[in-house]
Amino acid sequence: GVEHAILHLLYSRFFMQALSHQNNLFNIKEPFSGLFTQGMVCHETYKDENNNWVSPDELITKDGKKILRDSGMNVKIGPSESMSKSKKNTIDPEKIIKDYGADSVRLFILSDSPPEKDVQWSDEGINSSYKFLQKLWVLNQKIIQEIEANHPPSQNNNLDKITNKFIKDITQNIENFSYNKIIANLHETYTGLNKIILNKIEKEKLVENYKKILIVISPIIPHFSNECLEMINIKENLLWPKVEEKFLFEENIKFIIQFNGKTRKIIVSKKNTTESLLLNKIKEDNKLNEYLNNKNIQKKIFIPNKLINIITN
């Protein structure tokens, strides 16, 4: 926990101070530029009728209640606290890994909360991560099929956009220790890939982009990533991919159209559309133009690439 980590920092600073005073050639007084303390993994606590701590492995659920498996004795559920051997609110990592796999455990621990916050362990959470991994595996099978189909080249850049946005987001979130956001990025990219994977993407483009995605997710779910890389015969040149900024430029964006502060429609137009061009689009739209009929425009509030609010009387 935090207190434990701070003690290590205190000892380290003491040693560095002592060394710097005893050795004129040694002039490093601060051992670390910063300290990031991680949260704890927490679990519900349980006591039997004799007020003894009991382990989750000793319990079963019957009629919606927790009871001891061997004796049938009722169990009192206590607050969720950091896992400790004394309170027996631990889980057996070997059993969890055997049942769900190491990648599911990694996914769950990272996805539940920011790393500086406590993680609440739950069977539902680990099961949800396991099911998401199964979805990723099904998607992998679809991608393999599309690679084997060997489609001809096309000018569609949707896959490049998804891949480069993913690389940029993951890289930033790793550098910022925002590991829970990485899992959100993974869910978003999974949804995007599922939508475009049947668009007959050429083999070379599909392999190259999928390779980059697998490299980027390797710190999170390494076993899954390595297995998929082998399936597309990628065994070398596994450097962290660089972002190609040209694919992050959005040609069309959404503009919010408001009248007197109320949103009436969201329209799509080219990036950097001017106020006058946006006003022309509004007048060309029959429904939006109704808000202008027989009314005077008193004021226009225009925020580039975001919204226009037309004040009328």
Question: What does each of the following model-derived ranges do?
Answer:
Residues 36-37, 269:
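A secondary-structure boundary/capping signal
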Residues 147, 255-313:
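NTP/phosphate- and nucleic-acid-binding module
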Residues 7, 88-89, 208-209:
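Short, glycine/acidic-rich beta->alpha junctions
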Residues 10, 24-31, 95-268, 302-304:
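Helix-rich, typically C-terminal accessory recognition domains appended to large enzymatic cores
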Residues 9, 13-23:
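Alpha-helical support elements that line or immediately flank enzyme active sites
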Residues 37-47, 218:
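Short, conserved secondary-structure transition motifs
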Residues 1, 45-102, 116-127, 246-248, ...:
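Conserved phosphate-binding loops in nucleotide/dinucleotide-binding enzymes
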Residues 2-8:
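Acyl activation and transfer enzymes in specialized metabolism, enriched
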